């Protein structure tokens, strides 16, 4: 509580009277702050900190931030289907002071997404995992990967059943055996490995994770940018959006499309290079079209025009 009017009145006693006083205080606080008139959209505080102004980056207003940036529990629960998680975020980021600070994750030591089964390590499949990682590493927010997910470690195992199952047979089992061996890194996502860890790093999802991580690291717009999914700038894609970040030394713009084609409109003319395939497109009419993509495939066209 940041309002001293209420914080200073809180009673830290444990008697029935103390508890009753605090309950009444909570009710009084609620009634005083409540201005709900039947239309949540008109009364709920909103923020544009995560959104581009058109396709122009703007500074963030953190004046209403609580200081308690969140793990993105809502997206987490919906990551059984990446598009559901994405749609929720696009429609609700306005209710967070700055969703670019949200930590995105699929699973954790407590829960998997609601579908297929939140009580077990995620069993949605390798392709769904890859699609989720595409979104996590190119959308707003901070990606977070739970240990072992890059090899679908213990998928289908109950995450926790207390003393009723052994730790080894749970989703919280020891992962160290997968990391035995040697890794020599020469640069970000560039390495040689031997032993069991080499097999771990050679798994399809590990390779995919390394790729999307390297793409994110190379493109400032993906690391720190705001986004827009407005139909003024992109149509036709299930998960397609424009990312941009600008500071005194950087102007980074990227066009992202995941698992479907899309048409980007009203964008700067010039050269665009796809960070995934290396494909080059030259835009002359403000429009760039991405052909249809299969699930978990992605294109990230980076603007290399003059000034970028």
Model-derived regions, located:
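Short, polar loop/linker segments at the starts of domains and inter-domain junctions
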Residues: 117-126, 281-292
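A generic secondary-structure signal for well-formed alpha-helical elements
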Residues: 109, 113, 140-144, 155, ...
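Glycine-rich, aromatic-lined ligand/substrate-binding cores of catalytic
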Residues: 108-111, 125-126, 135, 144-147
């Amino acid at each position: 509580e940041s309002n001293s009017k209420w914080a200073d009145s809180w009673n830290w006693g444990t008697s029935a009277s103390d508890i009753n006083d605090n309950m009444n205080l909570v009710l009084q606080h609620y009634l005083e702050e409540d201005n709900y008139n039947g239309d949540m959209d008109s009364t709920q505080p909103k923020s544009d900190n995560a959104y581009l102004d058109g396709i122009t980056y703007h500074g963030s207003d953190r004046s209403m931030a609580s200081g308690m940036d969140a793990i993105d529990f809502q997206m987490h629960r919906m990551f059984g289907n990446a598009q559901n998680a994405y749609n929720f975020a696009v429609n609700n980021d306005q209710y967070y002071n700055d969703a670019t600070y949200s930590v995105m994750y699929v699973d954790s030591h407590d829960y998997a997404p609601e579908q297929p089964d939140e009580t077990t390590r995620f069993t949605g499949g390798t392709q769904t995992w890859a699609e989720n990682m595409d979104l996590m590493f190119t959308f707003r927010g901070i990606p977070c990967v739970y240990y072992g997910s890059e090899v679908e470690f213990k998928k289908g195992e109950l995450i926790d059943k207390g003393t009723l199952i052994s730790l080894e047979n749970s989703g919280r089992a020891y992962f160290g055996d997968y990391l035995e061996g040697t890794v020599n890194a020469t640069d970000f996502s560039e390495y040689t490995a031997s032993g069991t860890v080499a097999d771990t790093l050679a798994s399809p999802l590990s390779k995919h994770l390394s790729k999307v991580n390297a793409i994110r690291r190379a493109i400032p717009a993906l690391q720190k940018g705001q986004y827009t999914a407005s139909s003024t700038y992109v149509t036709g894609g299930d998960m397609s959006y424009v990312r941009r970040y600008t500071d005194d030394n950087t102007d980074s713009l990227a066009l992202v499309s995941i698992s479907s084609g899309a048409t980007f409109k009203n964008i700067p003319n010039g050269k665009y290079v796809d960070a995934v395939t290396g494909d080059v497109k030259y835009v002359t009419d403000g429009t760039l079209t991405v052909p249809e993509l299969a699930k978990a495939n992605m294109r990230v066209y980076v603007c290399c025009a003059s000034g970028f």
